[in-house]
UniProtKB/Swiss-Prot annotation:
A GO BP annotation: viral life cycle
Location relative to the cell: Virion; Host nucleus
Main location: virion
Family: Belongs to the lentivirus VPX protein family.
UniProt miscellaneous comment: This isolate is from a Gambian case of 'neuro-AIDS'.
Top-level taxonomy: Viruses, Riboviria, Pararnavirae, Artverviricota, Revtraviricetes
Name assigned to this protein: Protein Vpx
Known function: Plays a role in nuclear translocation of the viral pre-integration complex (PIC), thus is required for the virus to infect non-dividing cells. Targets specific host proteins for degradation by the 26S proteasome. Acts by associating with the cellular CUL4A-DDB1 E3 ligase complex through direct interaction with host VPRPB/DCAF-1. This change in the E3 ligase substrate specificity results in the degradation of host SAMHD1. In turn, SAMHD1 depletion allows viral replication in host myeloid cells by preventing SAMHD1-mediated hydrolysis of intracellular dNTPs necessary for reverse transcription.
Matching InterPro entries: Lentiviral_Vpx_assoc_factor (IPR053711), RetroV_VpR/X (IPR000012)
């Protein structure tokens, strides 16, 4: 009888997958920030980043990638709720900076 346990396919040691996951995380955060700045106030986006970093990285001692992941989860929820509540931008966005005038903010620290 054959061994029923799953085996790792050849060529997938896991290290390539982890590197791809970190790249995906960075790309996803950058894309989400570019979209969020059209729908949410800049101050909110920046504060979420600062508080995520202060809590998860500085206070809890979590890794940079985990901190980015938690930030991503919070921002995805914020954008989802914004759309669910009836975003009326119809794909055009609310303009740079959400509801506030001015140019869009720079990306949160550490994401450049």
């Amino acid at each position: 009888m054959a061994d029923p346990r799953e085996r790792v396919p050849p060529g997938n040691s896991g290290e390539e997958t982890i590197g791809e996951a970190f790249e995906w995380l960075d790309r996803t955060i950058e894309a989400l920030n570019r979209e969020a700045v059209n729908h949410l106030p800049r101050e909110l986006i920046f504060q979420v980043w600062q508080r995520s970093w202060a809590y998860w990285h500085d206070e809890q001692g979590m890794s940079t990638s985990y901190t980015k992941y938690r930030y991503l989860c919070i921002m995805q929820k914020a954008v989802y709720i914004h759309f669910k509540k009836g975003c009326t931008c119809l794909g055009r966005g609310h303009g740079p900076g959400g509801w506030r005038p001015g140019p869009p903010p720079p990306p949160p620290p550490g994401l450049v």
